[in-house]
């Protein structure tokens, strides 16, 4: 009948939901593999990158370094800082691709990428007693932990403005 909306086909809905679930599981496996392949950040070009940006605080174990992280847009492996995103139902990471000497971000597009669904999660860069401070980016959060905040605080990076809006607070 003309003008009446057609109800969605239950089989098509089920197919799309199964596809979305399979994709989420695949991305979670990829994120977990990326995290496991990465090494502690100390004495790596990821630490060099952060120190060159004036970050002086102790670097958290939520940050690691991957010497050959996959960059899908260019189909090649590039050094990257890998950050674990917590507070989510599935495992996810954020990658910042770096120049080989750690002097800055890699000259790639994009030079930052998320793997897995990150909305609602955050990277804890400092877990001290005190207020919760939420920043958009990892470097901003680390800068706050490097002395811009005058008292102890828990500092999170929500990764984007929409990430801040979706953040699940304790």
Predicted regions and their residues:
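Short helix-to-loop capping/linker segments positioned immediately adjacent to catalytic or ligand/cofactor-binding
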Residues: 37-38, 70-73
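Serine endopeptidase catalytic core focused on the charge-relay Asp
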Residues: 50, 54-55, 85-86
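Phosphate-handling DNA/RNA-contact segment within nucleic-acid enzymes
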Residues: 72-170
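Non-catalytic accessory segments of DNA primases and related replication-initiation nucleases
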Residues: 1-52
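A conserved helix-loop-beta module that forms one wall/lid of the active-site cleft
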Residues: 55-61
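Short, hydrophobic/aromatic alpha-helical segments in well-folded domains
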Residues: 46, 65, 140-143
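Short, small/acidic-rich helices and loops at N termini and domain boundaries
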Residues: 1, 64-68
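N-terminal structured subdomain of primase-like DNA metabolism proteins
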Residues: 1-5, 59, 135, 148
């Amino acid at each position: 009948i003309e003008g009446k909306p057609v109800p969605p086909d239950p089989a098509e809905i089920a197919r799309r939901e199964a596809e979305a679930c399979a994709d989420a599981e695949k991305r979670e496996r990829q994120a977990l593999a990326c995290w496991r392949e990465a090494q502690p950040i100390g004495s790596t070009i990821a630490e060099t990158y952060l120190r060159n940006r004036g970050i002086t605080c102790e670097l958290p174990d939520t940050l690691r370094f991957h010497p050959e992280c996959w960059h899908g847009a260019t189909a090649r492996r590039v050094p990257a800082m890998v950050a674990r995103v917590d507070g989510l139902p599935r495992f996810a990471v954020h990658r910042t691709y770096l120049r080989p000497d750690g002097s800055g971000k890699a000259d790639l597009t994009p030079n930052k990428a998320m793997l897995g669904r990150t909305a609602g999660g955050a990277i804890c860069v400092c877990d001290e007693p005190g207020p919760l401070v939420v920043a958009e980016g990892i470097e901003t959060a680390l800068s706050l932990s490097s002395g811009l905040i005058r008292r102890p605080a828990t500092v999170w990076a929500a990764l984007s403005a929409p990430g801040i809006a979706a953040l699940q607070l304790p």
